[in-house]
Amino acid sequence: MTGIRAIFYYFLVDLLTLLCWAQGKGGQHFGSTVVVSDVNLSNHGDQGSSEPPQTAEGCRGYFDVMGQWDPPFNCSSGEFLYCCGTCGFRYCCKFKQARLDQNTCTNYDRPVWLQPGKTPPKIDDPSHDPTRDKTNLIVYIICGVVAVMVLVGIFTKLGLEKAHRPQRENMSRALADVMRQQSHCATEHTERDPNLVIHVQHYETMPSRSSANNLHSSKINNVVPTSPHLPQMAHPHSYPTMGQISNPYEQQPPGKELNKYASLKAVAEKGNDDFYSKRRHLAELAAKGSLPLHPVRVDQERSYSPEGGTLKVNGQKAKANKIHTHPLASTYNPDYKTWDHSEHSLRRQAYATKKHCPVESVNEPLQSQNQHFMPSQPYFVTNSKTEVTV
């Protein structure tokens, strides 16, 4: 029984000894046993290999990513004793395991792209395939679509112009043919009817405001000269420029138009002056009461009408003399002809037919001219103050 207790105490003492050694507590008595702590269990040779103290480490100078030179510096402030970071950005730290191996960096020399006159060598990237790069494909597609649209618009415009061009040419040709037929018809009608006067006016050369002389001259040119006091100007061959109507597509020189207008104006003013001077002379004789009963013979001026027209007039006047049985009718001279409203209407009809003259009117017989001539009323001269013209 006593042996068992001794063994139990022995194990208990050993256990307590181990606990005290672990906690570093010495000098404690457990009963009769003294436990000694801080026992050096190592050999005597291991006592000389103690770790030396850490020294400060410096970072070397380098070129950063912007090409600027960063000077070297030392890590000697407190606990920050190690050079840490990357090759392009370095700093001091206190963890040894994060220290940077500066021997692996290559940015200690000046970069090539900073040296003037030298281009950096092209580094082929094996991961980059230019055949698979489609970033510029969108630009090419947009430019191609715009170019195609522009070409389509241009060709469409050209096609429309070409489609409308034959119609315009046909219209211009048809208009030219119609104008040419009208001018030819007007010329033929004028040559057939010598008692009609064509009054040609060029509106481009006429002034904006017409004077009194121009108005009188235009009225006289439109009147058929049936009286011997007014010279006849109906002959189309006296003034060749009046009988021909110019082509509207041909631009005449302004000098010829001015000469034509001046000649027509001079002839009209001369006829107007002669007519009114002779009429004033007859009015003065009628006022004085000294008009003779026999007709006054006035020398006829040179007539511009053809001889055929005067013969027809004389023949018609002879018929008129046979019809009238008035005593004074024997004194009537067939050469004297007064104004008649029927002739004015006939002239208006002639001008109307000239504007709408068909092609068949050129082949009409010449006997239709006799329809334009009607016997006119004679002019009787008396001494009465209330003289009336019939």
Swiss-Prot record:
It is found in: Cell projection, Dendritic spine membrane; Synapse. It comes from the Eukaryota. Its main location: membrane. GO terms for cellular component: dendritic spine membrane; ionotropic glutamate receptor complex; postsynaptic membrane; synapse. The chain crosses the membrane at residues 135-155. Component of some AMPA receptors (ionotropic glutamate receptors) complex. Regulator of short-term neuronal synaptic plasticity in the dentate gyrus. Associates with AMPA receptors (ionotropic glutamate receptors) in synaptic spines and promotes AMPA receptor desensitization at excitatory synapses. Belongs to the shisa family. SHISA9 subfamily. This is Protein shisa-9. It comes from Xenopus tropicalis (Western clawed frog).
